[in-house]
Amino acid sequence: MSIKISPSILGGSFSNIERIILDLNQSKAEYIHFDVMDGDFVPNLTFGPKFISNVREFSNKVFDVHLMINRVEKFLDDYIRAGSDIITFHIEINEDI
């Protein structure tokens, strides 16, 4: 069995996000985990597909995107186009997936 490490950038400072991603690019981690929160499904608010797209410009790591949002079906294609490689979401709130 092979273990994959997927560090989350959520704990980092968004004012220093480029440095965080560049450091992760130099690490042995194969994945970068993004916790996307909409302020509705969960009380916190993080970032959207444009942020994923911007980060994709300077990283070739696997983007592991965790959508903690309502109406995943409305936004799924946006996150795919943004450069997500893996998308995880909560099925209990999405009837049309």
Where are each of the predicted segments found?
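Conserved N-terminal beta1-alpha1 strand-loop-helix module at the mouth
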Residues: M1-A82, I86, N94-D96
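Conserved residues at the C-terminal ends of beta-strands
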Residues: H90
